[in-house]
Design a protein with these regions (language model features):
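Extended alpha-solenoid helical-repeat scaffolds
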Residues: 2, 8-9
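Acyltransferase donor/substrate-recognition loop-hinge adjacent to the catalytic core
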Residues: 4, 127-203
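A conserved beta-strand-loop-helix scaffold within acyl/acetyltransferase catalytic domains
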Residues: 10-43, 49-61, 179, 184-268
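Hydrophobic/basic alpha-helical segments enriched in Actinobacteria
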Residues: 33-34, 48, 59-64, 84-85, ...
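Short hydrophobic/aromatic beta-strand or adjacent loop that forms the aromatic wall/cage
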Residues: 35, 146-150, 319-325
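Acyl-donor binding region in acyl/amide transferases
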Residues: 64-140, 256-315
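Active-site-proximal cofactor/substrate-binding loop regions of enzyme domains
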Residues: 329
Length: 330
């Protein structure tokens, strides 16, 4: 019979023996600070499923009535179902009215499951999971809360004909674009962090993130930064928009030529909405990628809304879909 353990401190993760499921790294616990971590072990003591729990936060950082389930991994449907039952019991006992997952504490960290794989191989920093994991959640009574997609533009010669006009209009308004200054990387990220808090405030399940945690989330990217692919839009030294492109390092890892850029994130300050700044950032980033020899762009992990679908239609075709789940806790 499987046994469940509650772990409240990252140092205790080292006590979990090796098994079919890899234990959570202590660094992941420290970065996302869950309220508890659940480990399911078989009769031989091997880890067969794990997850972490949080109370969701609102846009002001205050706790809500939703509980989050993240850091999810399970050997099979039986182990996953048993683990999720324990997780739901914990959230129910804590007074949560619904559960959402998978989400590693907030939308600033890993969340959602890959649910439509397509034929394109996994790209750099893309969340991946076994194809049966979505069924673990639906079998436990979860239903889709939101869907997301990644789109591929395989023709970087296509440019937005409105860009030149928009550039003139924005420059007339005092807004100019430049590449990131790698010599001031932390200071540049601090400005991106501050602007992101405003730009993403209306996003689904948004909650604020501290600067230190934000900087830490960019640690995997820093060694691979290509300054020409990170564009900042400013007026009078104030950041009003950005786009963050990175090379798809999975391609050389597979022995293939590096030919794809990934648009990791893009945002425009709410005061600049409707000016065409987002479109100009996107177009200039793709032009820069083509100039550097890239042949394709992946627009990664966009929330499936009418606006994002129009962006996909203009710049490429959908190659992957992802789902975030929820269920009520009666």
């Amino acid at each position: 019979m499987a046994t469940i353990s509650d772990i409240d401190h990252p140092d205790d993760l080292s006590s979990l023996p090796a098994g079919p499921v890899e234990p959570l790294e202590p660094a992941g616990f420290r970065l996302t600070t869950p309220s508890r971590h659940l480990a399911l072990q078989d009769p031989a003591g091997r880890l067969i499923a794990r997850c972490s729990l949080w109370r969701a936060r609102d846009a002001r950082g205050a706790p809500t009535t939703a509980g989050l389930i993240g850091h999810y991994a399970a050997l099979d449907a039986d182990a996953g179902g048993e683990l999720l039952a324990h997780a739901l019991d914990r959230h129910r006992a804590d007074g949560c009215e619904r559960a959402i997952g998978p989400m590693d504490g907030s939308t600033w960290h890993r969340y959602r499951l890959l649910t439509e794989r397509g034929t394109e191989p996994t790209f750099f920093l893309e969340p991946d999971n076994p194809d049966d994991w979505p069924r673990h959640f639906t079998d436990a009574g979860f239903a889709p809360l939101a869907t997301y997609f990644s789109a591929l533009n395989a023709d970087l010669s296509r440019c937005d004909p409105r860009s030149d006009t928009r550039r003139v209009e924005l420059e007339r308004d005092g807004i100019t674009l430049r590449t990131i200054d790698v010599g001031r990387f932390d200071a540049e990220l601090a400005a991106i962090h501050e602007m992101s808090l405003a730009a993403f405030a209306d996003n689904l399940l948004y909650s604020p993130i501290g600067l230190d945690a934000f900087l830490a989330s960019y640690t995997p990217i820093r060694p691979h930064l290509v300054p020409e692919l990170v564009l900042l839009a400013e007026r009078g030294g104030r950041l009003l928009g950005f786009i963050f492109g990175i090379p798809d390092l999975m391609e050389p890892g597979r022995g293939e030529p590096l030919r794809t850029m990934i648009v990791k994130s893009m945002a425009v300050h709410p005061t600049c909405g409707g000016k065409g700044l987002g479109g100009l950032l996107m177009d200039d980033c793709q032009r820069a990628a083509r100039k550097l020899g890239f042949e394709r762009t992946i627009h990664a992990l966009m929330h499936e809304t009418n606006r994002s679908r129009s962006i996909s239609a203009r710049y490429g075709t959908t190659i992957r879909r992802y789902t975030l789940y929820e269920r009520a806790l009666p």
